[in-house]
Amino acid sequence: MLPYIALILVCWSVLSQAAQTDVEGRADKRRPIWIMGHMVNAIAQIDEFVNLGANSIETDVSFDDNANPEYTYHGIPCDCGRSCLKWENFNDFLKGLRSATTPGNAKYQAKLILVVFDLKTGSLYDNQANEAGKKLAKNLLKHYWNNGNNGGRAYIVLSIPDLNHYPLIKGFKDQLTQDGHPELMDKVGHDFSGNDAIGDVGNAYKKAGISGHVWQSDGITNCLLRGLDRVKQATANRDSANGFINKVYYWTVDKRATTRDALDAGVDGVMTNYPDVITDVLNESAYKNKFRVASYEDNPWETFKK
């Protein structure tokens, strides 16, 4: 009889600990933060930035004259202290990214949960934006999502620099629907990265028929200084009852003082060349009880409620 009682007590203890852990996890009121590794354009850089503490990356995407996504390439000029010329063929990068974000793959990085594609649509005419979205969707579906069969699990943000290129969003969505995978739009978010007036950004989303899954970026190269006025406008919109923004991120943040300022302004993400710097600040006594590094269980389209 005693062995059975002992077994029951052990099981009860394990279940109690699990329940307590679950409650503590759900009770965590700290703001989740996405640490975005900046300008990750070579496959080898994926591991490099994740190992430094990034849980998300930003990748540049250039287009050819026919609106096909061609390379993961930034070019000169770029951030101070960085090599501007690293690149991959876009589809090769997608395959490498898929390996890094597919559970069970030998190259899987569990911490990598979100990818921002900085779409260099400045080389395109306005009337090519819809076609660019369609071609981007086809490439992602085949080479990243593996045609919907156990592809990469990371959330994707399509970051567009020009408000006039909002038809890219519709083209992307229409192509996924046409190819039989509209459910993948659940994994896709949006950003306009041109530092336009917040009201103008909202109007562009209305034209695109988008409500939800909205990240709002603000920033400038690390070679220059930029204040946080527009960041505060974006966070005010996010926190208002009728705002259209779900998350706000600031770029490029490489210094501890700038990181603290951004966190104090209430951002959800910080784009950086030095993820370890951001991690260090998050561990400081003034911030570790207010913020935490986001995990895959954190919905990147959900507005954080204090």
From Swiss-Prot:
Endpoints of the signal sequence: 1-18
Keywords: Cytolysis, Dermonecrotic toxin, Disulfide bond, Glycoprotein, Hemolysis, Lipid degradation, Lipid metabolism, Lyase, Magnesium, Metal-binding, Secreted, Signal, Toxin, Zymogen
Catalysed reaction, written as an equation: an N-(acyl)-sphingosylphosphocholine = an N-(acyl)-sphingosyl-1,3-cyclic phosphate + choline; an N-(acyl)-sphingosylphosphoethanolamine = an N-(acyl)-sphingosyl-1,3-cyclic phosphate + ethanolamine; a 1-acyl-sn-glycero-3-phosphocholine = a 1-acyl-sn-glycero-2,3-cyclic phosphate + choline; a 1-acyl-sn-glycero-3-phosphoethanolamine = a 1-acyl-sn-glycero-2,3-cyclic phosphate + ethanolamine
Compartment(s) of residence: Secreted
Propeptide: 19-26
Primary location: secreted
Gene Ontology cellular-component annotations: extracellular region
Comment on bound cofactor: Binds 1 Mg(2+) ion per subunit.
Required cofactor names: Mg(2+)
EC number: 4.6.1.-
A biological process term (GO) from this entry: lipid catabolic process
Positions of disulphide bridges: 78-84, 80-223
Catalytic residue positions: 38, 74 (nucleophile)
Name recorded for this polypeptide: Dermonecrotic toxin LiSicTox-alphaIA2ai
Species of origin: Loxosceles intermedia
Origin organism lineage: Eukaryota, Metazoa, Ecdysozoa, Arthropoda, Chelicerata
